[in-house]
Amino acid sequence: RGLGDVYKRQIRRAEAYKYALTSKYIFYTQAFNWIGMSRRNQLFIDLWHGCGYKANKNGRKVFFDYCLVPGDIFIKTKMKFFGCTSKKLLSFGYPRYDMMLKGSERADEYKKKLLKETDSEKLILWMPTYRHASSERLNEETLNNEFNIPIIDDADKLLELNKFCKENHILIVIKKHYLQVPYDFGENVLTNIVYLENRDLADNGLQLYEFINCSDALVSDYSSVAIDYLLLDRPLGFTLDDYEAYTESRGWVFDDPLEYMPGEHMYNMQDFENFILDIKNGKDNYKEQRASVRAKTHNVCDNYCQRVLDYFNITM
């Protein structure tokens, strides 16, 4: 059936309850347990925020009729994660992939602005998973360094990385995970390392997955964004200096998670600098590995939004 007007309402407000109780289809990406229960003929579709490498740390209450995953390999892992049947899991990929694959002129202009301001030629997006969360129960005590960020153990390492990027005309944009407490780099003057939060993107009229599209490479670790980024077929680097600690603390959904990380495996600053040089020089050693992992982790299509709408017979 067709969709009418679109309204924005803040959750847990009276109007939000009204629409939640009367809507036929409810799409969401985070917990929707505040509504209490579904009504007859309602469908709750959890778009979810991503499938990555990390095993489940805390039990989750299933409150959906369907949940999306990028590909069939994640059906088994999410059955265990949510404690649900395979029938509730749809390997359609995420609607936000359309935005990531298409990009936007706004994002391209924002990238040009950042590169010009820093005298840089390429932009590496760094998206670490959270270690110290705003909620203590979610903390991952796997790093013990000054800034609570991988590889950068102290101010000397931070300034070394900044100098190396400046000399090689590379800009690193660190995008904080929304659960991570803010990074504090103190009074260190950084020319080629920029730190962004969601509000910075919003102030420039951007959504995160628009901005991801304009990056020349991605640095991550165990975050699901690395799986998403495979669709762009661009270089990936994985910071793994707390891999052993994370194995003990959280564990993995794959028996050998490193096999599903098709990119530079970085354990120290020298590894990171080598990755930066490869990006500068257009060197890509992992294209075939990315293709192999992408085939296992994604159910690729041309229009992810339309795939979801078609499944539920929704026309617009």
Regions found by a protein language model. Give the residues of each.
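C-terminal alpha-helical cap of glycosyltransferases
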Residues: C301-M316
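Catalytic binding pocket for nucleotide-activated donors in carbohydrate/polymer assembly enzymes
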Residues: V189-T191, S224-T297
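A donor-sugar binding/catalytic signature common to diverse glycosyltransferases
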Residues: Y25-C51, D203-R250
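A short beta-strand/loop micro-motif in the catalytic core of glycosyltransferases
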Residues: I26-F27, D65-G71, L90, L171-V173, ...
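Short, small-residue-biased leader/transition segments that mark boundaries at the very start
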Residues: G2-Y7
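Membrane-proximal helix-turn-helix segments that form the acceptor-binding/catalytic region
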Residues: E15-Y17, K57-C67, L159
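A nucleotide-sugar donor-handling region in carbohydrate enzymes
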Residues: C51-K54, V62-I149, Y178, N285-Q289
